[in-house]
Amino acid sequence: MSMDTANNDQGTDLGKVIDISRIIQMIPHRYPFLMVDRVVQVVANESAVGIKNVTINEPFFQGHFPSRPVFPGVLIIESMAQTAAVLVVETLGESAEGKLVYFMSVENCRFRKPVGPGDQLMIHVFKERSRGNVWKFRGEAKVDGVLVAEATYAAMILDEK
């Protein structure tokens, strides 16, 4: 059985890969603000692992910083939030239609190492809890297995209109 079709006892796809064409159906973000290129693992209602490929073609590198390009830390956090939004949509299924995931708060944010062009961010998000339409997550971003950023954050799921 391939990883794409492996299921656990609850029917959750453990090895499900969500490519960019599906991501743009799931969340409203677009270039230049789409900060997740692929989701390589989703365990509905639990966790997800996303990828952000950092390239020199990102528009913010013109000013952050021209002599030493550094991926802005706030965009690492945004990558975590967008990966969490994919997890929310995957968890809610059809009931997510007509809903948006709004970023609410960030706590305990730490940036450990700079990220630059050529790096691949592995974004690990873990659902800590949900109460009603408010979900809380813990996120970690790694490059080559090394922790570069971490945070806890919350989101609210509301009707789109």
From Swiss-Prot:
It catalyses: a (3R)-hydroxyacyl-[ACP] = a (2E)-enoyl-[ACP] + H2O. Its EC number is 4.2.1.59. It is found in: Cytoplasm. It comes from Paramagnetospirillum magneticum (strain ATCC 700264 / AMB-1). This is 3-hydroxyacyl-[acyl-carrier-protein] dehydratase FabZ. Belongs to the thioester dehydratase family. FabZ subfamily. Keywords: Cytoplasm, Lipid A biosynthesis, Lipid biosynthesis, Lipid metabolism, Lyase. The lineage of its organism: Bacteria, Pseudomonadati, Pseudomonadota, Alphaproteobacteria, Rhodospirillales. Its main location: cytoplasm. The active site is at residue 64. InterPro entries: FabA_FabZ (IPR013114), FabZ (IPR010084), HotDog_dom_sf (IPR029069). CDD domains: FabZ. It comes from the Bacteria. One of its GO terms (molecular function) is (3R)-hydroxyacyl-[acyl-carrier-protein] dehydratase activity. Involved in unsaturated fatty acids biosynthesis. Catalyzes the dehydration of short chain beta-hydroxyacyl-ACPs and long chain saturated and unsaturated beta-hydroxyacyl-ACPs. One of its GO terms (cellular component) is membrane. GO terms for biological process: fatty acid biosynthetic process; lipid A biosynthetic process.
